[in-house]
UniProtKB/Swiss-Prot annotation:
Catalytic class of the enzyme: isomerase
EC number: 5.2.1.8
Cellular component GO terms, alphabetical: cytoplasm
HAMAP family, A to Z: Trigger_factor_Tig (MF_00303)
GO biological process: 'de novo' cotranslational protein folding; cell division; chaperone-mediated protein folding; protein transport; protein unfolding
Full protein name: Trigger factor
Family as reported in the entry's similarity comment: Belongs to the FKBP-type PPIase family. Tig subfamily.
Molecular functions (GO terms): peptidyl-prolyl cis-trans isomerase activity; protein folding chaperone; ribosome binding
Gene label: tig
Length: 434
């Protein structure tokens, strides 16, 4: 086997590989003979079909298969010999056979050489927060509102009430599509409607008819309504006030607390809040570390890896439609290219961090991650056992643990400052409610 390597552009490499033609001819001959022994062709006894007949019928297909196998095998031997690390499958172009040698070209991309830079320039503001008694009480109040019952009242509508109404919206005196509804139910203070809509209902009673003036936000989804002034003619048909359940042992029973009553509920709430806080704190720091790593390290990315990640993201997006994708057009790659490139870059950089620091997934950390995740389920021990018995899930958890360890390694050289934050403020930002 003779090999020449050419760097064409960027990470692309072109291998020209020559192998003795007799190697292919021998393999083709052997394959034809094997086929002749097992072929069943009318007019010939089993095992007695002439090779010339087999060659006429199947020779082209057999030669094509053998050629593919020879190219694949010799390509692997060549990249091992040349110490090349392909980032994707090669494209093979077979050449002509001159009787003495068979030559083919393999084109592919290699992984970039990654040299980590600017690790000591990564800046991280590490938030410090804890769950207080007031936070637990606030969560209980939220749960009370979620379990509220509503009853009709004859007073003016107030924040927190539910209202039922009929309305018609218009712009410049003309009704617009989607601006009309009957028996529409809305909880005041929910923020479901455009600015000014809910505020315009406050202070009105059931049976009243009135008009409110609002302006659609510039970022509104309907192009024809962006920034437009509108009027809504409203008929308020019902005002319903919330009746909140009392906070007692019966309230605790609503959440499956059979023993310990209210105090047991508070303990469970605090445990869940602490778990969510810990996850959010980790995610916040990780995002800052990753962003700093990306900003300080520019590397060339193999197109093959980006294309592969685009396909993964596209499949995930299609699955979110509930599998109803048979008649849907394929989502364009451009929708996912930026996110795919980011994920590939993160993977390559963290891979180098793991390699440089000789990191291996710590078993204790893996089990701690599984236990933390399982604690959100009714029977944590069953979930832990399921994970430990599933190789694919365990590998996923090892990858998560290894990523955590890589982030911690980067934190050691980063510029870290701590900042005290309130639980509610931090969690609102973390969940996008700020």
């Amino acid at each position: 086997m003779q090999v020449s390597v050419e760097a064409t552009q960027g990470l692309e490499r072109r291998l020209t590989i020559s192998v003795p033609a007799e190697q292919i001819e021998k393999l083709v001959k052997d394959s034809l003979q094997r086929e002749a022994k097992r072929a069943r062709i009318p007019g010939f006894r089993p095992g007695k079909v002439p090779v010339t007949v087999i060659n006429k019928r199947y020779g082209a297909a057999i030669r094509q298969d053998i050629t593919g196998e020879v190219m694949q095998r010799n390509f692997i031997e060549a990249i091992i010999a040349e110490k090349l690390n392909p980032a994707g499958a090669p494209t093979f172009v077979p050449g002509a056979t001159d009787g003495e040698k068979f030559e083919f070209v393999a084109t592919f991309e290699i992984y970039p050489e990654v040299e980590l830079k600017g690790l000591d320039a990564i800046e991280v503001e590490q938030p410090k927060a804890s769950v207080t008694d007031a936070d637990v009480d606030s969560m209980i109040e939220t749960l009370r509102k979620q379990h509220a019952t509503f009853a009709a009242v004859e007073r003016e509508a107030a924040d927190g009430d539910k209202v039922k109404m009929n309305f018609v919206g218009s712009v410049d005196g003309v009704e617009f599509e989607g601006g009309k509804a009957d028996d529409f139910e809305l909880q005041l203070g929910s923020g479901r409607m455009i600015p000014g809509f809910e505020a315009g209902i406050l202070g009105h009673k059931a049976g009243e008819e009135f008009v409110i003036d609002v302006t659609f936000p510039e970022e509104y989804h309907a192009e024809n309504l962006k920034g437009k002034a509108a009027k809504f003619a409203i008929t308020l048909t019902e005002v319903l006030a919330a009746n909140l359940p009392e906070v007692n042992d019966e309230f605790a029973a609503l959440f499956g607390i059979s023993e310990g009553g209210l105090e047991a509920l508070k303990t469970e709430i605090r445990k869940n809040m602490n778990r969510e806080l810990e996850q959010a704190l980790k995610a916040n720091v990780k995002e800052q570390v990753i962003n700093g790593l990306l900003a300080n390290n520019d590397i060339e990315l193999p197109k093959a890896l980006i294309d592969g990640e685009v396909n993964v993201l596209r499949q995930q997006a299609m699955q979110r439609f509930g599998g109803q994708t048979a008649n849907m057009p394929e989502l364009p790659a451009e929708l996912f290219t930026e996110q795919a490139a980011r994920r590939v870059k993160i993977g390559l950089l963290l891979g180098e961090v793991i390699k440089t620091n000789e990191l291996k997934a710590e078993d204790e950390r893996v089990q701690a991650l599984i236990a933390s995740m399982a604690s959100a389920y009714e029977d944590p021990s069953e979930v832990v056992a399921y994970y430990n018995s599933n190789k694919e899930l365990m590998q996923n958890m090892r990858n998560v643990a290894l990523e955590e360890q890589a982030v911690e390694a980067l934190l050691k050289s980063a510029k870290v400052t701590e900042k005290e934050v309130a639980f509610e403020e931090f969690m609102n930002k973390a969940t996008g409610r700020a």
